[in-house]
């Protein structure tokens, strides 16, 4: 019998904790010997979607391409962990329909908290006008309406949030 794959899509503002959570979940799943791949938005932009900008059209195309790869891996029994801002609700809904086996994780942190966590200085640059189309500053972020999991990273610890995602995978029979 083949294993059922699933895509777990971590969405939220820059600095909310998407990469930290997806890597923490991956570490736990790998410790159990499960097939896992992490598709991190920053790394994907350096390779798979190099050349795309940050306009709405380019961001939607970025999400479609990540969704295409995630669907292929999911179809082959892999647990795919995507960490990408993916600011537009319609684009996330499109990849949800395309992939099928899909769990949306809203990594929810207030803008002020994300700005304080800004290790790359991106918010500072966006506020200074050096970066345009920056989600949360001069570009919108559309929160999910009904995500399967909500991680409030300003209130919950990283281990608590990782456990919420693992429990969601378990309750749906993926783990």
Swiss-Prot record:
The protein's Enzyme Commission number: 2.7.1.25
GO CC annotation, single: cytoplasm
One Pfam assignment: APS_kinase
Binding site for ATP: 12-19
Reaction catalyzed: adenosine 5'-phosphosulfate + ATP = 3'-phosphoadenylyl sulfate + ADP + H(+)
Biological pathway: Sulfur metabolism; hydrogen sulfide biosynthesis; sulfite from sulfate: step 2/3
Gene Ontology BP, a term: sulfate assimilation, phosphoadenylyl sulfate reduction by phosphoadenylyl-sulfate reductase (thioredoxin)
GO molecular function: adenylylsulfate kinase activity; ATP binding; sulfate adenylyltransferase (ATP) activity
Function: Catalyzes the synthesis of activated sulfate.
Name of this protein: Adenylyl-sulfate kinase
Species in which this protein is naturally found: Synechococcus sp. (strain JA-2-3B'a(2-13)) (Cyanobacteria bacterium Yellowstone B-Prime)
